[in-house]
């Protein structure tokens, strides 16, 4: 049953008595949220002892890490961390995975509805028509050492691509371009989607010393990516359909994940109204961190460091003693098993022939078994998330561990584009969070 937000929700409010002044305030509650700006009404006389508290300017809300702060309204993705559910535009991923293609899901996220057959064909045609980047863009990637940062190659490639169309940069043309201009925003979305796939493939080919194969019209987004990276069958020159199907489902699962650290970084940058490539660079840089997207590569290396099943108990003991961290377990949002985890295990089961070649997966399964039965983990609601096994899907498909994160970013590009497009349709307001100054005041240069 479709549930829609009430047009006129009942009036609710938070009542505050400030014991500093005895003043009473009523702050409206809408969608189980209060407007932080309403606290500016809660003022007090200047704090003479420490003026930096700015009591006369209104009460501030301190929330390090944004653990309980909503910074925007969005209609794209809904996550219920207590129930372990994810919905894209109101559709459960349980109903989407295996029934809709990745490109259909991208259309849903970005444009708000499932594409008709004609719309899906048009989207694929527009992607096919995006030209291969100019040679200087590829040369930037090739200037890196082959064993250099793959993430750095992608970021550098994007930066070079940005310079190939200076008229797409608002600061260069001296005006805002994309705000409330969905047609122009959509052109950039198509440009980024196509080029992210090509640049990521180019970085991979440079890394392993393989020639880059240009995309081919008539192939799907994922088929073309596998073609560009050289992951094709000798007999047909085309990607293995089983591998295409595995990536289709995996990328549907991780196409968007609401207000993540990287999405917030993208939107923080977008609030200043630059071009979309600048926003993507911000998002990718945030994803590189081991507490965010980098966790997928770290989770694999964490399992790799264990080495064998016999070493699992010692690893668990070190984690419980606080000496080490078990990446791939626990999540900022979920208090139950990550809903994507179940589907990823299904994908791995279907790739059993390839998976058997990776003995580390048996170690990962043993870690999962031991942790799921250990009171230390169960009492803290530390359950496996998608990071733990997603890496093994890519490994089974023939990609090295160091390419896991670039693959993850490519799969998330469509989600980033959805959030950027939504932001460009909202009233402009630069994100400029405050701080609580706790340092010294009024020092003398003579002291």
From Swiss-Prot:
Keyword Secreted on entry: no
Single GO molecular function: acyltransferase activity, acyl groups converted into alkyl on transfer
Root EC class: transferase
UniProt keyword terms in alphabetical order: Transferase
Residues annotated as catalytic: 331, 387
Pathway: Secondary metabolite biosynthesis
InterPro entries for the chain: Citrate_synth-like_lrg_a-sub, Citrate_synth-like_sm_a-sub, Citrate_synthase, Citrate_synthase_AS, Citrate_synthase_bac-typ, Citrate_synthase_sf
EC number: 2.3.3.-
Keyword hit for Ribonucleoprotein: no
SUPFAM superfamilies: Citrate synthase
PROSITE patterns, per the entry: CITRATE_SYNTHASE
Any single GO BP term: tricarboxylic acid cycle
Biological role stated in the UniProt entry: Citrate synthase-like protein; part of the gene cluster that mediates the biosynthesis of oryzines, natural products with an unusual maleidride backbone. The two subunits of the fungal fatty acid synthase oryfasA and oryfasB probably form octenoic acid. This fatty acid is most likely activated by the acyl-CoA ligase oryP to give octenyl-CoA before the citrate synthase-like protein oryE catalyzes condensation with oxaloacetate to form tricarboxylic acid.
UniProt family annotation: Belongs to the citrate synthase family.
Protein's name according to its UniProt entry: Citrate synthase-like protein oryE
Organism encoding this protein: Aspergillus oryzae (strain ATCC 42149 / RIB 40)
């Amino acid at each position: 049953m479709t549930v829609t937000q009430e047009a006129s929700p009942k009036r609710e409010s938070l009542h505050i008595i400030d014991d500093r002044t005895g003043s009473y305030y009523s702050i409206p509650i809408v969608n189980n949220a209060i407007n932080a700006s309403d606290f500016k009404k809660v003022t007090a006389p200047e704090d003479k002892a420490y003026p930096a508290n700015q009591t006369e300017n209104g009460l501030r809300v301190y929330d390090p890490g944004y653990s309980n702060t909503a910074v925007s309204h969005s209609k794209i993705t809904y996550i219920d961390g207590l129930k372990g559910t994810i919905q894209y535009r109101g559709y459960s991923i349980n109903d989407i995975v295996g029934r809709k293609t990745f490109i259909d899901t991208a259309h849903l996220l970005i444009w708000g509805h499932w594409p008709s057959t004609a719309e899906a064909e048009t989207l694929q045609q527009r992607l096919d028509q995006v030209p291969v980047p100019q040679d200087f863009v590829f040369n930037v990637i090739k200037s890196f050492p082959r064993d250099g940062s793959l993430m750095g190659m992608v970021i550098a490639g994007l930066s070079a691509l940005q310079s190939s169309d200076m008229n797409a940069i608002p600061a260069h043309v001296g005006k805002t371009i994309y705000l409330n201009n969905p047609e122009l925003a959509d052109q950039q979305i198509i440009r980024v989607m196509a080029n992210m796939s090509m640049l990521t493939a180019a970085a991979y080919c440079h890394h392993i010393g393989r020639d880059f194969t240009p995309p081919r019209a008539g192939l799907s987004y994922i088929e073309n990516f596998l073609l560009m990276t050289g992951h094709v069958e000798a007999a047909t020159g085309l990607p293995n359909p089983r591998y295409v199907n595995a990536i289709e489902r995996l990328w549907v699962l991780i196409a968007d994940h609401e207000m993540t650290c990287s999405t917030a970084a993208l939107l923080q940058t977008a609030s200043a109204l630059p071009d979309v490539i600048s926003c993507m660079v911000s998002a990718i840089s945030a994803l590189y961190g081991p507490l965010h997207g980098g966790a997928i590569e770290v989770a694999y290396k964490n399992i790799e460091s264990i080495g064998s099943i016999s070493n699992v108990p010692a690893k668990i003991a070190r984690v419980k003693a606080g000496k080490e961290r078990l990446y791939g377990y626990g999540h900022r949002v979920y208090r139950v098993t990550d809903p994507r985890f179940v589907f990823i295990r299904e994908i791995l089961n279907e790739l059993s022939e390839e998976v058997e070649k990776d003995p580390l997966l048996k170690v990962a399964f043993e870690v999962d078994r031991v942790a799921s039965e250990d009171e230390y983990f169960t009492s803290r609601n530390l359950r496996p998330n998608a990071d733990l096994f997603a890496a093994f899907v890519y490994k089974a498909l023939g990609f090295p561990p160091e390419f896991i994160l670039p693959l993850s970013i490519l799969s998330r590009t469509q989600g980033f584009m959805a959030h950027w497009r939504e932001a460009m349709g909202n009233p402009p307001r630069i994100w400029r969070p405050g701080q609580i100054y706790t340092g010294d005041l009024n020092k003398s240069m003579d002291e």
